[in-house]
Amino acid sequence: MRVKGIRKNYQHLWKGGILLLGTLMICSAVEKLWVTVYYGVPVWKETTTTLFCASDAKAYDTEVHNVWATHACVPTDPNPQEVVLENVTEDFNMWKNNMVEQMQEDVINLWDQSLKPCVKLTPLCVTLNCKDVNATNTTSSSEGMMERGEIKNCSFNITKSIRDKVQKEYALFYKLDVVPIDNKNNTKYRLISCNTSVITQACPKVSFEPIPIHYCAPAGFAILKCNNKTFNGKGQCKNVSTVQCTHGIRPVVSTQLLLNGSLAEEKVVIRSDNFTDNAKTIIVQLNESVKINCTRPSNNTRKSIHIGPGRAFYTTGEIIGDIRQAHCNISRAQWNNTLKQIVEKLREQFNNKTIVFTHSSGGDPEIVMHSFNCGGEFFYCNSTQLFNSTWNDTEKSSGTEGNDTIILPCRIKQIINMWQEVGKAMYAPPIKGQIRCSSNITGLLLTRDGGKNESEIEIFRPGGGDMRDNWRSELYKYKVVKIEPLGVAPTKAKRRVVQREKRAVGIGALFLGFLGAAGSTMGARSMTLTVQARQLLSGIVQQQNNLLRAIEAQQHMLQLTVWGIKQLQARVLAVERYLKDQQLMGIWGCSGKLICTTAVPWNTSWSNKSLDSIWNNMTWMEWEKEIENYTNTIYTLIEESQIQQEKNEQELLELDKWASLWNWFGITKWLWYIKIFIMIVGGLIGLRIVFSVLSIVNRVRQGYSPLSFQTLLPATRGPDRPEGIEEEGGERDRDRSGQLVNGFLALIWVDLRSLFLFSYHRLRDLLLTVTRIVELLGRRGWEILKYWWNLLQYWSQELKNSAVSLLNATAIAVAEGTDRIIEVVQRVYRAILHIPTRIRQGLERALL
């Protein structure tokens, strides 16, 4: 009974053990995921970077120096690539776009740079004795004669090449460029910016004509473009593409009206950072341009006044003919139609309120009037006629009416305080002759009056002055992103690594204690080497940045333009991005690989999604956002894993190196010797068995029965050869059995001898057989060749005979045919000759 109870208990224990083993097997069967590095994944992040410019080489005149310095830009790509991003939704915000700030800074720097080598007009900051230029007609008209006092003839004392001598000169100035010194005396004036700014005269051959500039992203960066036709500049865009450069943007410096820009593809679009905030500017993009033609009809002349060694001041000398006022013409029908479309959009935004357009509320001339550059002169046009209407339900209820053309009176200003900067002013030299220019109005800048929301009227005025809004009207659909080509994701693949395992210890292991320590010390510095590699890269980049700052500080000496600096910066950025990525790939042991497995296990705390949900349902952008908070941790673990791998390899190499001195005494070497010996013995035994079997088969074929391998049997003699006796000295035949031997070495020698003899006989027989076969094949081949040669000769002769027979038959047939033709011709000829004779005979018979 006791034995049966023990057996029952063992049965329960056996079942429990099997169940536990099955559970362990199931748990161990769960697939483990490992971190895999991917290079070149489509992931980007918003960033700010230095953009460089591209421009059409044929877009500028080489005779003059354009203020935009586009000759320093790279040529435009004749086939620009635009890649549409399917199923991508991206956020855009034109009001927080660093591209706008960068363009603003670039344009200001370009203007400043173009003025650096030009003449400073400090000697002209003297008292000017001015009087009004007499006009033949003082009628104030939009397109008639200029108002009295608009142009002043001023005389002043100027020091020329000799410092102690003063000479009196005169020049014509516009009213906007001078201010009275004393209100009591209307004859004493000074230049408008002398008390606040240093006035620099624009160089004579500088042109202000806007040239399209393409902003381009350096390598490692990209520009995203929103292609929604009704995009308001802020929010999500579902039609996104990536480009390397923007479209050509003309840096037109103007206020109130946007000139020569891009048009909306469908309806008019209005954009604002916040429509409820009346302090925010409203940018209007038209869908159809409105032509504006401007002219300065006065025929001006230009003269130069020397104000020092190598310096000249250019001013208006005389005005030939009538002094007529500059003006601009706009089609009233086109303008009213444009306002009607703008009103529709404004009423949608402001709850169908009455829309009122009115003139500017005041400020600097650049704000109050529509200012722009026309042919080198800076026009300031009164835009009251454009913004003087009330719209109720998209119908114009009141406003200035007139003929079909709106004529805007314009004034000209030569001293420009650009960009509202303090301490800097520019004097634009007068342009001789008449000036005409034509532009396209593609947008408006509006401001809304504040007040209580209960009012049913919204008043809008022309705005401007901040050139950033001009650039926003073109850059609203772009944003710069940084490409992040490195991505990590879980996979089932694991990197094969060198494990730290115990070596077999031989006699030389006694010396490996301290010798191996030297290798461990070198391997322990791998962390330090990693840090040094990172610091080295940072030092290179920092050195390049310092060099760029030095070049930028000394660019007036190096004659580098703003675009040249930006191109250098863009190249450095590209190199930096590449080096950074390659540095990480090298630290991780992934150099030159696009897909790199690692030995880092995937932690489900980073993401517990399954492989199918990751690889089949998520984009790289979504996955990057999923693990964004753990990316640095994963990078660190990959780096530590690679460091451990390199340390293991280093220690393994160290052990191999020092163990080689004592390899004859290492147990691994002796195991190798034993393995070779066993292989040799096994081979001999196998050969012995094979040849024994062959010998037995051979003997059986000859009529002998297989006996023991070591039994000596005398060969039987033939009936014609009787056996000899011991006393007789007859000749003995060779026995077929060998002599019995004793000992292992003797047996090996006999076997090897038999093996070599057997191999020799078999190879000889094989060689003889091959020789006979080759001889037979050669003989047969020669006979076949002779047969084919005879056959070829026979058929050649037959063909020759057939050809000769054919030619003979043809010749005979031709000869017979020729004879018949000749006979027919002769008969015809004789008949013709006999015709007169027949006629004569017929006449004779008739007469008889």
From Swiss-Prot:
Annotated segments matching region V5: 452-463, 454-463
Region of interest called CD4-binding loop, as start-end residue ranges on this chain: 360-370
Region (Fusion peptide): 504-524
Region listing for V3, in residue ranges: 294-327
Signal peptide stretch: 1-31
Region of interest: V2: 154-194
GO molecular function per UniProt: structural molecule activity
Intervals of motif Di-leucine internalization motif: 847-848
Cytoplasmic topological domain residue ranges: 698-848
Chain spans, region Disordered: 714-735
Disulfide bonds listed in the record: 53-73, 118-203, 125-194, 130-154, 216-245, 226-237, 294-328, 374-437, 381-410, 590-596
Glycosylation, residue list: 87, 134, 137, 153, 157, 185, 195, 228, 239, 260, 274, 287, 293, 299, 329, 336, 352, 382, 388, 392, 403, 440, 453, 603, 608, 617, 629
Top-level taxon: Viruses
Keyword tRNA processing: no
More details: Inhibitors targeting HIV-1 viral envelope proteins are used as antiretroviral drugs. Attachment of virions to the cell surface via non-specific interactions and CD4 binding can be blocked by inhibitors that include cyanovirin-N, cyclotriazadisulfonamide analogs, PRO 2000, TNX 355 and PRO 542. In addition, BMS 806 can block CD4-induced conformational changes. Env interactions with the coreceptor molecules can be targeted by CCR5 antagonists including SCH-D, maraviroc (UK 427857) and aplaviroc (GW 873140), and the CXCR4 antagonist AMD 070.
The protein's name: Envelope glycoprotein gp160
Species name: Human immunodeficiency virus type 1 group M subtype B (isolate JRCSF) (HIV-1)
Gene this chain is encoded by: env
